[in-house]
Swiss-Prot record:
Topological type in the membrane: Multi-pass membrane protein
Organism lineage string: Eukaryota, Metazoa, Chordata, Craniata, Vertebrata
Leader sequence segment: none
Record's keyword terms, sorted: Membrane, Mitochondrion, Mitochondrion inner membrane, Repeat, Transmembrane, Transmembrane helix, Transport
Single GO molecular function: transmembrane transporter activity
Solcar repeat intervals: 4-83, 95-189, 198-286
InterPro entries named in the record: Mit_carrier, Mitochondrial_Carrier, Mitochondrial_sb/sol_carrier, Mt_carrier_dom_sf
GO CC terms, sorted: mitochondrial inner membrane; mitochondrion
Listed PROSITE patterns: SOLCAR
Name of the protein: Solute carrier family 25 member 47-A
Gene3D superfamilies referenced in this protein's UniProt entry, alphabetically: Mitochondrial carrier domain
SUPFAM superfamilies (UniProt xref): Mitochondrial carrier (SSF103506)
Family, per entry: Belongs to the mitochondrial carrier (TC 2.A.29) family.
Transmembrane intervals: 3-23, 54-74, 97-117, 173-193, 200-220, 262-282
Length: 294
């Protein structure tokens, strides 16, 4: 078993969160709140109402959880590749890469869902204790990640932490399959024959493009996931489930709403996944050179 990939994935994921969190907050608000009509309008209103602090609401828990989920994704991916190669007694194909990425994306949902719903709810909480404008000074519902986590458990039970888990799996399975296939293909194409490891410029470019392609696939289901996670926070629940949310959203807002945050997803994904893969590659090479880690 490749243990190094679990650790390296954890390091890469944590660094990626730190880089991309402000734009992730903007993305979630655009997806779930009609008052925000575009990227710059959302950024300006957030700064005016909440200050810079508004972009970092709920970041502590995602750094912890995404560190774990990224570990699961990369570790599962690498070990699935190893298993498929061993079973077939042959080199891995692109289909192997795709299926291993799919397995990694689905596997991490059980770990990711609780932290993700807390992240989304805190990001969509526009009331701020740190408001820079007194007229916007309204007490927020959640005082922080732990309070939000406990409030969800108290109001909805443990199952509330997994509201939106199905669309999360439907988002991350195909998204990570595309993600790893894109990275693998670009690295292979851009690395000269006979060279064992890709150059760092290739790693950075391939990681950035992989992130964008993964989000291009995952954005529509990401909208559904975010809406289900926010449903009922400000009153009565609107959606009965995934299909009902999909139907109502399409009927009332049109198909375009599923791609409203695609631009910011791609804008955020490129630098984030440059960092994720760069840190992952550095870490995995160092760890594999250590005598006790394979």
């Amino acid at each position: 078993m490749h243990f190094a990939d679990f650790l390296a994935g954890s390091f890469g994921g944590a660094c990626g969160v730190a880089v991309g969190y402000p734009l992730d907050t903007v993305k979630v608000r655009i997806q779930t709140q009609k008052q925000f009509t575009g990227i710059w309008q959302c950024i300006v209103l957030t700064i005016r109402k909440e200050g810079v602090h508004g972009f970092f609401k709920g970041m502590f828990l995602p750094i912890t959880t995404i560190s774990m989920t990224s570990s699961v994704v990369f570790g599962t991916y690498r070990n699935c590749l190893q298993a498929l190669s061993y079973i077939r007694k042959a080199e891995n194909t692109k289909l192997d890469v795709f299926m291993s990425g799919l397995a990694g994306g689905v596997a991490q949902v059980s770990v990711m869902s609780p932290g993700d719903i807390v992240k989304v709810r805190l990001q969509c909480q526009t009331e701020s204790r740190h408001s820079v404008n007194p007229k916007y000074s309204v007490k927020p519902k959640y005082s922080g990640p732990i309070h939000c986590l406990l409030s969800i458990c108290r109001e909805q039970g443990l199952s509330g932490l997994y509201r939106g888990a199905l669309p999360l799996a439907l988002r991350d399975g195909p998204s990570f399959a595309t993600y790893f296939l894109t990275y693998h293909t670009l690295c292979a194409r851009l690395t000269p024959d006979g060279q064992k490891e890709p150059e760092w410029t290739v790693v950075l470019l391939s990681g950035g493009v992989a992130g964008m392609s993964g989000w291009a696939v995952g954005t529509p289901m990401d909208v559904i996931k975010a809406r289900l996670q926010m449903d009922g926070v400000r009153g009565q629940r609107r959606y009965r489930g995934l299909l009902h949310c999909l139907t109502v959203t399409t009927r009332t807002e049109g198909l375009g709403v599923f791609f409203r945050s695609l631009g910011i997803n791609c804008l955020r994904a490129f630098p984030v996944n440059m960092v994720v893969f760069a840190v992952y590659e550095v870490s995995v090479r160092v760890l594999r050179s250590a005598p006790l880690v394979s």
